[in-house]
Amino acid sequence: MKESDFPKNSMEALEKLKIGNDRFVNGLRSVEHFPTPSKLKDLADQGQRPYCIILSCADSRVPSELVFDQGLGDLIVLRVAGNVIAPSLLASMEFATTSFHTPLIVVLGHSRCGIIQATVDNLKDRFKPASENIQRLITKITPSVEPHLAQNGNHPNLLDLCAIENVYHTVKSILDESEILRDLVKEQKLAIISAFFNLNTGRVEFNPSLSDHLSAI
């Protein structure tokens, strides 16, 4: 990305994502996702200038570069099942924001999330994790699922409600666990926002509303 194209602040960065997602939803593309060897060399020589960090689920149907129609070097994408936070992910965010002055972090959940479903099933004694590592992941997601399972257990949008709650929980964890990122937010040099990707439509909802998903049948 040219320096002149780099967003001046988090709002401009967010607008680039919104416009890119509009293109994706409408089947349009403005970015060369498969550059030629000469273009790759240019990118390597120029270095990277990512304007956004995206923490998304490991689900193979949620490729951030395509969902937001962004090119190589535009985004730092961190992927882990359930888009939960861990020390290595926090360190990656801290490194990017301090090295590249990246102004925006997006935590991206999505509909029909497999690990959210597994957490629901685990709480209902319908799923036994195959390993301690999977159990630890489910344990981390459980606080976002338990309240909705108790209050909205039969709601058709239960998984979406839990996924959105989990996104907000991750944003809070980032702010709680990283002094560097917390200070950048206070200084208005960084914004950390929640987002939700609808697999059916391709649309990304920023700062998703739980009440909207509760009322939607």
Protein language model regions, located:
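Short glycine-enriched loops at secondary-structure junctions
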Residues: 56-61, 81-84, 110-113
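Short helix-loop-beta junction
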Residues: 69-77
